[in-house]
């Protein structure tokens, strides 16, 4: 880290210009000045009357190490000789009211383990990375035309030691990475790892944005974990929260006794949804703090993506009775995305946004917000409501399963089955399914089959892969003992086979963001709650036919219109006995019948399993086969594109 001497910095650069290396100025840096080794402390506190650095090295005496104000706008700095890495410290701030308050360093890269709240001097330089091969391979691929399977997890509750203590960053290399590799996830998405005082905030209410939480080890330990993920071909996405922060006394809240990082106006300062306060995104120093922070995680931790939390809460003011857009936030998000993609054009910037705000994943130079992915919250809500409905009544809400295809190409979407849907009394995915024990597992297999064949990249929260029965318990770990039960083992086997099939099947991801990649065969069979569609890859022969039955009925000799290939093989059936199903499968090769059906040139007759998904792959095309109008067979989209990519 190239530390900048504050006296040499232009006064206005941090306060009035885009300055995205503010971590080089602020914080505690181990340096040598005038041939004396020590630590340079620098902080921004615009309304402080006086500032001191306090810690064990001066017995927390406010009078010993007074800081010098180096800009009129409130940058304070001090070099303290002969103190070293590992010292704990805080800033003692004399407010305009004459009080002295103690604050952790906003730019500290390390902190004490909670419940202690002091910052820790840590030299973040020196980690030797070994991920050049990962970076080289990443640049050769288009994230839009590749398979993407994201495993979302909470670091502290995925797995715990027998005594209930947490695994460290380094220990999780041995525990988590082999598991992720076995399941063929392409990425992990970790809930926030910034320093936070309250375990049950899950990291979303942070105090130390530059400090990887010390619950699990040092910053270098986390770097090692990321490095090892890259070694095994796993991308690392972090949850990141630039909208709001917690009100704990030692944190950013009223940092110098006045609103510093938050809005002054109480109407927009307070965030009643979470009991937090909102960042003042119109203030240049705050923007520099946050955008520098994003780049800091990219540069020093080699992170591959951010899932930007609560974008909807940023885009609109939370004034009671009003829904007015926050132009500060809109401008900030555009500036953020421009800075991130200038740093790494292959980075993943995903918006967690539940609104209908347009052009979220459109580049800023085309008038968009500039993200490259967005969670499809509408799909998630509609599909889960449909699945929770009793099967005999699903025909009355049939449109919940088809509506997503009206807007599927308006943005670059990730389909999230996330932590938000399996907590706070919402039940686990398995327990959302109606019916008896067998029905629940059959319908979860069906849901996953639909999930992996619907356009959009994939995200699943931990535990879903083996059918966690209880909803997520953040103070415990996953119910790993469920593997002792046969149906959970079947579910786990099914999930691993499904994700493997997804990854090796280009039609399921190659044209995720193009209407040419999807065609309904029959979207209107609400009476039987059966949906059939085609997923298409770049090549004509790269096509799959998918049939989903959302009732418990079994249908023999069911006609499905298909493109004119000579034969089809069933390559996956969720009702197979090895997955815990009843065994209503199509074992034999399916010969195409040259009679038009479902607006297709031909059809096959198959067995439709109860609560089942069947995936068919063409085997051989007829030479010169033609449709009724004389044109050659080609899969055409019948869904709506809204002009995005």
Curated annotation (Swiss-Prot):
EC primary class: transferase
SMART domains to which the protein is assigned, alphabetical: Aamy
Pathway(s) where this gene product acts: Glycan biosynthesis; glycogen biosynthesis
Protein keywords: Carbohydrate metabolism, Glycogen biosynthesis, Glycogen metabolism, Glycosyltransferase, Transferase
Regions annotated as coiled coil: none
Family the UniProt entry places it in: Belongs to the glycosyl hydrolase 13 family. GlgB subfamily.
Name of the protein: 1,4-alpha-glucan branching enzyme GlgB
Gene this chain is encoded by: glgB
């Amino acid at each position: 880290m190239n530390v900048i001497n504050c006296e040499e910095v232009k006064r206005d650069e941090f306060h009035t210009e885009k300055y995205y290396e503010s971590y080089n100025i602020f914080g505690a840096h181990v340096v040598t000045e005038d041939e004396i080794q020590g630590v340079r402390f620098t902080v921004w506190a615009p309304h402080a009357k006086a500032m001191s650095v306090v810690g064990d090295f001066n017995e927390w005496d406010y009078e010993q190490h007074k800081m010098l104000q180096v800009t009129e706008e409130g940058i304070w700095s001090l070099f303290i000789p002969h103190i070293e890495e590992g010292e704990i410290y805080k800033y003692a701030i004399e407010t305009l009211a004459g009080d002295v308050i103690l604050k952790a360093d906003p730019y500290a890269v390390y902190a004490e383990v909670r419940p202690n709240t002091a910052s820790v001097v840590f030299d973040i330089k020196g980690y030797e990375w070994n991920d050049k091969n990962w970076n080289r391979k990443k640049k050769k691929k288009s994230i839009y035309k590749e398979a993407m399977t994201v495993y979302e997890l909470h670091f502290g509750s995925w797995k715990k030691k027998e005594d209930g203590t947490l695994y460290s960053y380094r220990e999780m290399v041995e525990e988590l990475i082999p598991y992720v590799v076995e399941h063929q996830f392409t990425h992990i998405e970790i809930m926030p790892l910034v320093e936070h005082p309250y375990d049950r905030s899950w990291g979303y209410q942070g105090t130390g944005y530059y400090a990887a939480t010390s619950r699990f080890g040092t910053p270098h330990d986390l770097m090692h974990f990321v490095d090892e993920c890259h070694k095994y071909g796993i991308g690392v996405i972090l949850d990141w929260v630039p909208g709001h922060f917690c009100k704990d006394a030692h944190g950013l809240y009223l940092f110098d006794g006045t609103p510093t990082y938050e809005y002054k106006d109480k109407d927009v300062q307070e965030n009643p949804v979470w009991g937090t306060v909102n960042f003042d995104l119109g203030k240049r120093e705050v923007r520099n703090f946050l955008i520098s922070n994003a780049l800091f995680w990219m540069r020093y931790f080699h992170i591959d993506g951010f899932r930007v939390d609560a974008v909807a809460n940023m885009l609109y003011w939370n004034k009671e009775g009003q829904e007015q857009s926050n132009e500060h936030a809109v401008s900030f998000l555009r500036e953020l995305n421009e800075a991130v993609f200038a740093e790494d054009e292959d980075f993943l910037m995903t918006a967690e946004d539940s609104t209908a705000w347009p052009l979220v994943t459109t580049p800023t130079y085309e008038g968009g917000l500039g993200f490259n992915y967005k969670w499809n919250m509408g799909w998630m809500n509609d599909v889960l409501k449909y699945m929770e409905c009793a099967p005999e009544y699903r025909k009355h809400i049939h449109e919940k399963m088809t509506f997503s295809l009206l807007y599927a190409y308006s943005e670059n979407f990730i389909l999230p089955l996330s932590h938000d849907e399996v907590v706070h009394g919402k039940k686990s995915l398995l327990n959302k399914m109606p019916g008896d024990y067998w029905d629940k597992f059959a319908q979860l297999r069906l849901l996953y089959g639909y999930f992996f064949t619907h356009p959009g990249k994939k995200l699943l929260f931990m535990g879903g892969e083996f059918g966690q029965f209880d909803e997520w318990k953040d103070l415990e770990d996953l119910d790993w003992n469920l593997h002792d039960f046969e149906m959970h083992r079947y579910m786990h086997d099914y999930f691993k086979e499904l994700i493997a099939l997804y990854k090796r099947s280009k039609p399921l991801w190659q044209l995720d963001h193009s209407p040419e990649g999807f065609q309904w065969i029959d979207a209107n069979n609400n009476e039987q709650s059966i949906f059939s569609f085609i997923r298409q890859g770049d090549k004509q022969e790269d096509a799959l036919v998918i049939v989903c039955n959302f009732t418990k009925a079994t249908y023999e000799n069911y006609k499905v219109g298909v493109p004119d290939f000579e034969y089809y093989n069933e390559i996956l059936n969720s009702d197979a006995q090895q997955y815990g199903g009843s065994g209503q499968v199509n074992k034999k090769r399916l010969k195409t019948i040259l009679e038009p059906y479902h607006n297709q040139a031909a059809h096959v007759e198959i067995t439709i399993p109860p609560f089942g998904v069947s995936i068919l792959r063409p085997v051989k095309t007829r030479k010169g086969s033609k449709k009724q109008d004389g044109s050659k067979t080609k899969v055409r989209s019948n869904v709506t594109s809204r002009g995005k990519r």
